[in-house]
Design a protein with these regions (language model features):
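N-terminal leader segment of winged-helix/HTH proteins
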Residues: 1-29, 76, 99
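Short, solvent-exposed amphipathic helices
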Residues: 21, 97, 101, 105-108
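A cross-family signal for key residues in well-ordered alpha-helices
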Residues: 39, 72, 99
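Alpha-helical residues within the helix-turn-helix
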Residues: 55, 72-73
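Short, hydrophobic-biased segments on the C-terminal half of alpha helices
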Residues: 68-69
């Protein structure tokens, strides 16, 4: 999109209502540990336990659990109890677009 497209009316800016709705989600996702968790869950393609996520994130249970709670509170993740385990999965697939941008920036 360029300024000429906006001036000609062929494209429009994202509404403030939409931006206000998604800003808290972006703010909460934009944390290195949370991004790492999302990257791991995306690559696994199926729900994973806290212990699996701890191992992949190379972090302790308290830190991982705190980050999972934040993502769950924003409806980015779902949590489902199976026996003694709680399995986490990505609920809002649109956040994966942010990961794609990061992966693109990682390339030399």
């Amino acid at each position: 999109m360029n300024t000429q497209d906006l001036k000609s009316g062929s494209m429009s800016l994202i509404s403030m209502e939409t931006l206000e709705r998604v800003a808290p989600i972006i703010r909460n996702v934009a944390h290195p540990m949370r991004l790492r968790i999302l990257d791991y869950l995306d690559q696994q393609g199926e729900p994973r336990s806290v212990s699996d996520i701890m191992e992949a994130a190379e972090a302790g249970q308290a830190i991982v659990s705190q980050q999972l709670r934040i993502l769950k509170d924003q409806d980015v993740l779902t949590a489902k109890r199976e026996g003694n385990f709680v399995l986490y999965a990505i609920a809002d697939r649109s956040v994966l677009l942010l990961l794609d941008c990061i992966r693109h920036r990682q390339q030399p």
